[in-house]
């Protein structure tokens, strides 16, 4: 019995050890966010709660019919039954909204959790690296593509096309000419250009043209970097959010989304499985013990039945002698149900012979009374105590009916006293 009580005591522990899928969200200060929560069953209470300092306590933020005071007009809950999930929208986020949340279903907020959400609110997003095509030397776009894309920002490219028939080159290696210009403006011995093309004149008479085009090139480079940085930041942010949201419902419904196979550790399933197996083993032992007891009891009952059947004929009490003829009971005798006394000798001669043969030292025997028939008189049946009265009538002693007798109830006063000695016997 103690073992069963311990098992029932530790069964709720298996629910607390369940590992919830976790989603991490990073939102800008003052922005909004959508939290997708799984909905394993419909027509139940849906909620989003916030975990307090004590991990065992989770305060409800929003549910089907409730919104916490601090989150009113900022949090909404929208069920989506066809997708088996419900959405929680949080707007106007502040630093106080940062923390750990959990969404779930059921009437009990602490036991029905299905997902854990970690929300981070930042003032500004960190600097992201430059686009990947800025670092690769072989991924430069052609000049004509830039002309169609940004015609107003690249007027110097059109000038370069008409001024220089030699075109654009990716890598140029030249020897520094001997001029009187200051050494600061002289290029190095080997010069490599891998980002943006430059125009070089065929003669050395116009050395100031490339220097005049440097501001336009710098402005274009700065604007291109800023545009690519914004695009990359937005793309990286959405990609990260999508990648973090995928395990949330992928683990519940198929674990596969857009070709991404996500594996989540499910070692927590082993605990209830082991407990269930242990309960099955104990139940089997109890059933086996009950069957053994039932079989032992049936064998014991069978042995007792056989023993009683064997002793039955030997313990039968004979109600009457087999050789004695049955005497029919008189139908008119209303006292036939009362017990009968032992029969007296049939005649007087036999009684007298017994008296003569008795030894002299023996005490004198009581006088024998021969019972004869008595006229029928109505009796009052008050009890089963009867008085037998008899006298010697003037009839033949050898009469067959002389031994018949009747019983009359013992009355306090007898109606009459017939002549002769009439000792009473009970």
From Swiss-Prot:
It comes from Rattus norvegicus (Rat). Residues 1-16 form the signal peptide. CDD domains: IgV_pIgR_like (cd05716). GO terms for biological process: Fc receptor-mediated immune complex endocytosis; humoral immune response mediated by circulating immunoglobulin; immunoglobulin transcytosis in epithelial cells; negative regulation of extrinsic apoptotic signaling pathway; negative regulation of lymphocyte apoptotic process; regulation of B cell receptor signaling pathway; signal transduction. InterPro entries: CD300_family_receptors, Ig-like_dom_sf, Ig-like_fold, Ig_sub, Ig_V-set. This is Immunoglobulin mu Fc receptor. Disulfide bonds join 37-103, 49-58. The record marks 268 as: Receptor capping. The keyword Signal applies. Interacts (via Ig-like domain) with IGHM (via CH4/Cmu4 domain), both secreted and membrane-bound IgM; the interaction is glycan-independent and multivalent theoretically involving up to eight binding sites for the IgM pentamer. The Ig-like V-set domain comprises three loops analogous to the complementarity-determining regions (CDR) of Ig variable domains, which are responsible for engaging IgM. Mediates multivalent interactions with the CH4 domains of pentameric IgM, facilitating receptor clustering and signaling. It comes from the Eukaryota. GO terms for molecular function: high-affinity IgM receptor activity; IgM binding; polymeric immunoglobulin binding; transmembrane signaling receptor activity. Phosphorylated on both Tyr and Ser residues. O-glycosylated. Sialylated. O-linked glycans regulate trafficking to the plasma membrane. The record marks 386, 405 as: Receptor-mediated endocytosis. The modification Phosphothreonine is found at residue 91.
